[in-house]
Amino acid sequence: MGGRGMGISELKLPAAVKVHELADAKTLAATLAHDVAERLRAAIAAKGQACVVLSGGRSPVPFLEKLASEPLDWAKVTVSLADERWVPVEHADSNAGLLARHLLTGAAAKARFVGLYQQAENLDAAALKADQALTGLPPIDVLVLGMGDDGHTASLFPASPNLEAGLDLASTRRCLPLLAPSVPHQRLSMTRSLLASAAFIALSVQGPGKLATLRAALAGNDLTEMPIRAFLHDPLDIYWCP
């Protein structure tokens, strides 16, 4: 891992957090896909259906492709997104488009997809429509989160309007409109209350930069400063590679 590199094992993590330290990005993608699929198979065996909520961005592509090739009864799986950019599915920045290209192909195309993007006159109206659409989402069996260098997760960004509502565990909202510092700014995000309801939560992070972000997140407790903190003290499985 290089002389200077610090491993994730050196972080002081809460008792409920389990760490999977992988050799490289390829191994992380394969291991996470295997573990997610195993939990989805168990959910199908137990109750006849499974629900997985995934995150967008560039880094999950190898994981999504690995997950698509896992032997699963995809017709019994509901797939949704922790957050979405308020752009049509055809847009290059669409998380739904990302899933369509890299996950919902072959056998996995049989899965039911519940997206967040809604056509509406403005972002607030779109979030209300998404909130309604999510009433049909089964209980979440598996949630896979990512984390930005600023400590955001899903589209729960520090300094965004609606962030406090998005982090409120007592909130009955499933989806809220939020603003990202980067383009496209307008986002739709599942709320913490919905995300935290997942039976199994994985956080997938790569590289020393994300390790430094995790260290900073663990050192404080202001959720609005680093929203990932909202998930670091619940049962959580962190998948990390250098």
Curated annotation (Swiss-Prot):
Domain of life according to the entry: Bacteria
The biological processes this protein is annotated with in GO are:
carbohydrate metabolic process; pentose-phosphate shunt
In terms of InterPro entries, this protein maps to: 6-phosphogluconolactonase_DevB (IPR005900), Glc/Gal-6P_isomerase (IPR006148), NagB/RpiA_transferase-like (IPR037171), PGLS (IPR039104)
| GO-annotated molecular function | 6-phosphogluconolactonase activity
Transcription regulation among the record's keywords? no
EC main group: hydrolase
The protein depicted here goes by the name 6-phosphogluconolactonase
